[in-house]
Amino acid sequence: MTSGPFFFCVFIIGRYFTLGNAQDVSCPLGSFPCGNISKCLPQLLHCNGVDDCGNQADEDNCGDNNGWSLQLDKYFANYYKLTSTNSIEAETSECLVGSVPMHCLCRDLELDCDEANLRAVPSVSSNVTVMSLQWNFIRTLPPNSFRKYHDLQKLCLQNNKIRSVSVSAFRGLHSLTKLYLSHNRITFLKPGVFEDLHRLEWLIIEDNHLSRISPLTFYGLNSLILLVLMNNALTRLPDKPLCQHMPRLHWLDFEGNRIHNLRNLTFISCNNLTVLVMRKNKINHLNEHAFTHLQKLDELDLGSNKIENLPPNIFKDLKELSQLNISYNPIQKIEVNQFDYLAKLKSLSLEGIEISNIQQRMFRPLINLSHIYFKKFQYCGYAPHVRSCKPNTDGISSLENLLASIIQRVFVWVVSAITCFGNIFVICMRPYIRSENKLHAMSIMSLCCADCLMGVYLFVIGAFDLKFRGEYRKHAQPWMESVHCQFMGSLAVLSTEVSVLLLTFLTLEKYICIVYPFRCLRPRKCRTVAVLIFIWITGFIVAFAPLGNKEFFKNYYGTNGVCFPLHSEDTGSTGAQIYSVVIFLGINLVAFIIIVFSYGSMFYSVHQSTITATEIQKQVKKEMILAKRFFFIVFTDALCWIPIFILKFLSLIRVEIPDTITSWVVIFILPINSALNPIIYTLTTRPFKEMIHQLWYNYRQRRSVDRKGTQKAYTPSFIWVEMWPLQEMSTEFMKPDAFTDPCDLSLVSRSSRLNSYS
């Protein structure tokens, strides 16, 4: 923005191409032609980086070159062609401005004094046409600083330390067309400071400290086309005709200021304005007639402000508008007919806006719309006539499939099958393992039921992925708002929280039995049943509470296609964010810490009790087995929960997380415990392994009998005794005759528990 060649390059790159003869081909709604051939492709295959048409037509014209790039084409192309031709013809390497200051360079009538340690404007020949004084130490521009330079056309004063500009500093610069004052410390410009600059076309005052302006500030700028006031400290614009003395102004840029509202009279005289940029301000209110007189406006950028409400007729008079950006505003509601008058609109940006009442009717009048940008890719289904809709995916789903990745589509079934089969198998086999501690068995059965719900959740997600295969964009938003999605999300959270609480309870039970074997702390039947009921009730409350208060939680489970609320920040509800943090960084994190501490204490306690044992080598071996088992339990918990803790913490501090992470967490990380708990707590335990060995032994015995026909097989009971924990075993069974001392009994008790892990 600081030189002509830059804008010329932007113009060349941003040229607009039409679609050729594509309009001659008739395609169904949601599909678009492949250039001048009769082939049609759906919206999702256009501008995806792949030549799906075969003639590259689906990848042509994908750039959004509407708005300011077209204005460069219209207003500056011919000018640069003419000036560049003249400069080539007249170019010479000889210096024609006489003597120049030290550290300065001269060529033809151009003076380059960049980084020359200047503290004032140098004095050179009056015929100089270009003067660049960038990166110096000029602090003030006194009166008549440039008065003798009548032929000066371009003046660059960027990156100095200018604080004060005299009202007559630019007097006499009747030929000046471009003035750059960017990156200085200017706080105020007096009325009439540009009075003599009748030919000035570009005025760039970017990155200064201007706090106020008035129409008189720009008095005399009759030829001004481009005015850039980016990144200043303006808090308001005058409620007077700002363009009163700039009748030819086409481009006005106020990006990065602190403007709070736009008044009705501010732009009343800006009849020729084609580009208005107001992004990154603090605008929270728009008067309904603020843009009424901008009937030639081609681009309006109101992005990244604090606008909550759009007046119904705010865009009514913008008949020529081709690009509109209202993204990243906390807009509460967009009227169905909000864009009805924007028939020429080609690009619409609605990123970062939750459109609760979205429908096709909103965008149907926008017959020329070629690019649209949403917060959620699911909204693209409501603009099927728009060729380029972004984003194409949220990292989990795509316009085509609920699960975007083929790996996820396959493994959702694999993980679901493993989880369901493993837990159902344990539930079915548990009655055949007669546990001396029925309360422990009851807890394990309850854990399997909770883990099985995770498998059901994954199964349903896989089923709906199959149902929507190839046309998910049509069903995306209704699916995420549906009762099915809300219920399955609740089921996943119920499974997760009940599993977490049950694992914590089982761990504390083991901890008490091993570390305090002779204290009366063991839960009885009524107490255990009460704890299990309490855990399930708590899980139901945590999981289903968001469904009971939509105003507080918004669409808590419907922020993504898999219906899991890992990133509750997407809901736009502070309450939902706090609730999610309490669950993932409160309940679950505390539970994980308790489990790690308890298993560490258990291992230490068993290790201390076996130091005095006579069979040291046996005890060391048993300790190693115990250590491995404890490590595996803690490791699987850590593998499941630590990534979730990290992701939740990063999202809480607003660190950008790749969109694809959520789906991988839900399908591969979250079900780890649900899939492995049956293995850890049943299938690898000593009673179960002994039962399997006994079944194999019986099978071999029967085969032997069948072969011999005479020998009768010994067939023990199919029911096996589970040896751990030994809470309900009789005293006679627990206490050997050789030990009568409580300390020795403690050793035996702990050793018995140690044996049960092997």
UniProtKB/Swiss-Prot annotation:
GO term, biological process aspect, one: nipple morphogenesis
Topological category with respect to the lipid bilayer: Multi-pass membrane protein
Family matches, as InterPro entries: GPCR_Rhodpsn (IPR000276), GPCR_Rhodpsn_7TM (IPR017452), LDL_receptor-like_sf (IPR036055), LDLR_class-A_CS (IPR023415), LDrepeatLR_classA_rpt (IPR002172), Leu-rich_rpt (IPR001611), Leu-rich_rpt_typical-subtyp (IPR003591), LRR_dom_sf (IPR032675)
Superkingdom of this protein's organism: Eukaryota
Residue windows of the LRR repeats: 105-125, 126-148, 149-172, 173-196, 198-220, 221-244, 246-269, 270-293, 294-317, 319-341, 342-365
Quaternary structure and interacting proteins, as annotated: Interacts with C1QTNF8.
MF (Gene Ontology): G protein-coupled peptide receptor activity; G protein-coupled receptor activity; hormone binding; metal ion binding
Stored Pfam families: 7tm_1 (PF00001), Ldl_recept_a (PF00057), LRR_8 (PF13855)
UniProt-recorded name of the protein: Relaxin receptor 1
Domain LDL-receptor class A: 26-63
Segments crossing the lipid bilayer: 409-429, 444-464, 487-507, 528-548, 578-598, 630-650, 661-681
Localization, UniProt: Cell membrane
Keywords: Calcium, Cell membrane, Disulfide bond, G-protein coupled receptor, Glycoprotein, Leucine-rich repeat, Membrane, Metal-binding, Receptor, Repeat, Transducer, Transmembrane, Transmembrane helix
Cysteines joined through disulfide linkages: C27-C40, C34-C53, C47-C62, C485-C563
